[in-house]
Amino acid sequence: IVEEDENRIVMKDLMDITEVVPQKNIRREHLLVKRMVSDVFQAASDMDTERLEGMADRDTEVDRIHWMVQRQSRILLKDIGLSAGMGVDLRTVTGCVSVSKTLERIGDHAVLMAIHTKDLIKAGGKDLCADIGSMGDGIVKLMDSCVQAWMNTDRDGSEECIRMAEAQTKAIVSAFGRMEMTDESLPVDVMAGSSRRLAEYCADIAEMALDSAMERA
């Protein structure tokens, strides 16, 4: 903060955007979001609410990285020489913004799921929690594969990820459809919707990867 009064605050941005390429920020954001999602499902499996503590703070860090990616992209798109000096083409810059936004949305769902997972655990819904927790590995693996396909501009990998996402979405719908609903039906409905959205967001990243690969072919 370089200047402050009752009506305004003037801040100086000290971040050097050339220090970190956008892809590295995507990787950081992915790892944070992956851990958030993993912890939600693991907490359900273990009936462990402590694993869900601090989820909002972690989401704030994800939001911060997304803001950084957006700001970096605006600067790089205005200065082609700067982006060239960093070895980053403009298609990658715009792609980073789209992937970052998708990861940020996944993080938002992880926070929502954490809230309702706590409710299920406190209500003693052990069987429901176990069923929900069993989906975690598949969703986390899908997320990893989709982000990696985008990072590598992998056409074959992205096509496989799209198929994986479709299968995962069907598996989620089927699994929740088999669950016996009790008084905890509202949290379960939210978990079902968010789990499906996670798979759909992963598919979005895979489609971005495919588009990028086809552009470079």
Regions found by a protein language model. Name each.
Residues 1-217:
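Cytosolic, long alpha-helical scaffolding segments
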